[in-house]
């Protein structure tokens, strides 16, 4: 397999190894669901050796018959192979020469606790994690006003003006890459500035972005070129009709949010009926897929609306998008599906303890982006329904 994981194939070698320098918190945790008990093993960054700190490595390995799992905290960390962006390369790690009388000290703080479920265990971890690492103070390198000024400049510098269309580019290329912290999302802060110049640029971007790139189902393809034609890249090079679920979920949430912002700014007359119709078609596509499949998967077929690749939390942002769309379009069925999807996503998180599927370039690995997307969606549901359970679930995430 091209990513670090325990093997899904019974009997195959099954091992994960990672150096502490690649972790946000130096800890191995495990949860016994039957006993409702959890254990956390916190370590230092590594060992002190001849004036240097040598990273620990964390290793988890399953036996061939899967009857036992071994967890190792090694000193120093020497991985068998080094994980790359996708795949592995030869490990650069080296051991140390130990002489008679040398001492290696490994400090491990073990925390055992009762936990009724995975979210409870993770909440305990969040309470403990800073207690076992060296305290760090914030590094205030520049005032927030300067950060905002630089970000506005960065987005403005990517505004493309062509013979036919003009729009904000989310990447360093003259194409529209939808969603994924980019296309039809980077327009929100520009719209919030409130001036006429940025409003005009945002409107041009909506005209181009919403006027192109949609399949027959209402879902959008991942990328559209400056000629208005779909660009098939990544997995779509092999299977043309697929589109990343996460990108479409981002479009839905942020487009409804931006149309709401325009109305709050007293600029509702700037909202083109074509925008509203296209965004509603996208909301309808999410509803139709959910009714048919009971999930939005990792990828959808932009033409048929069927799930092309299953599993993951890739559609997390669509929960919030449908919740907003229910209010914007006065369409209760959107809220019905938003609630159903929120329950399915949260129940899966509560079972496995992570979310995944937001990043098209890391397969179905766990990621932080779906975690914050689902958190945002839960908060949106709380704000739109006042149901306190969504606030609690957002806190768990």
Segments the model singles out, each with a brief description of its role:
Residues 214-215, 263, 287, 291-292, ...:
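Helix-capping and short linker residues that terminate individual alpha-solenoid repeat units
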Residues 211, 218-219, 241-246, 254, ...:
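Extended ligand-binding clefts on enzyme/binding-domain cores
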Residues 1-277, 281-284:
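Carbohydrate-recognition beta-sandwich/jelly-roll modules
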Residues 233-239, 260-332, 395-397:
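Active-site lining segments of carbohydrate-active enzymes
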Residues 193, 202-210, 216, 258, ...:
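Alpha-helical solenoid scaffolds that mediate protein-protein interactions
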Residues 315-352, 367-397:
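Active-site neighborhood of glycoside hydrolase catalytic domains
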Residues 150-171, 246-250, 291-299, 336-358:
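Extended glycan-interaction surfaces of carbohydrate-active proteins
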Residues 90-94, 165-183, 233-252, 298-317, ...:
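Solvent-exposed loop and edge beta-strand segments that line ligand/cofactor-binding
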């Amino acid at each position: 397999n091209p990513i670090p994981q325990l093997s899904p194939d019974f009997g195959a070698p099954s091992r994960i190894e990672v150096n502490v320098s690649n972790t946000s918190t130096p800890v191995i945790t495990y949860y016994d669901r039957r006993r409702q008990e959890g254990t956390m093993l916190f370590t230092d960054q590594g060992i002190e050796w001849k004036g240097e700190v040598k990273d620990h490595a964390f290793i988890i390995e399953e036996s061939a018959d899967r009857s036992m799992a071994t967890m190792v905290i090694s000193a120093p960390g020497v991985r068998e192979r080094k994980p790359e962006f996708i795949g592995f390369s030869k490990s650069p790690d080296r051991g140390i020469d130990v002489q008679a009388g040398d001492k290696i000290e490994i400090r491990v703080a073990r925390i055992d606790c009762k936990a009724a479920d995975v979210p409870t265990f993770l909440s305990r971890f969040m309470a403990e994690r800073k207690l076992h690492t060296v305290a760090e103070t914030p590094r205030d390198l520049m005032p927030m006003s300067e950060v905002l000024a630089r970000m506005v400049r960065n987005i403005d510098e990517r505004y493309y003006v062509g013979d036919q269309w003009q729009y904000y580019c989310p990447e360093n290329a003259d194409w529209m890459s939808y969603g994924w912290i980019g296309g039809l999302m980077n327009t929100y802060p520009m719209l919030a500035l409130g001036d006429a110049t940025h409003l005009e640029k945002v409107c041009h971007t909506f005209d181009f972005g919403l006027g192109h790139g949609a399949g027959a189902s209402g879902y959008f393809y991942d990328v559209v070129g400056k000629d208005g034609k779909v660009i098939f890249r990544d997995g779509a090079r092999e299977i043309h009709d697929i589109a990343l679920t996460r990108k479409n979920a981002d479009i839905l949430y942020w487009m409804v949010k931006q149309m709401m912002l325009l109305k709050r700014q007293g600029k509702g007359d700037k909202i083109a009926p074509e925008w509203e119709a296209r965004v509603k078609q996208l909301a309808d596509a999410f509803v139709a897929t959910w009714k048919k499949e009971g999930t939005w998967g990792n990828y959808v077929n932009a033409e048929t609306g069927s799930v092309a690749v299953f599993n993951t939390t890739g559609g997390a942002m669509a929960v919030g998008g449908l919740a907003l769309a229910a209010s914007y379009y006065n369409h209760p069925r959107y809220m019905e599906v938003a609630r159903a999807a929120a329950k399915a996503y949260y129940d899966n998180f509560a079972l496995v303890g992570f979310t995944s599927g937001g990043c098209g370039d890391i397969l179905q690995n766990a990621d932080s982006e779906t975690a914050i997307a689902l958190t945002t969606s839960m908060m949106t549901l709380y704000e739109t329904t006042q149901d306190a359970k969504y606030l609690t679930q957002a806190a768990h995430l």
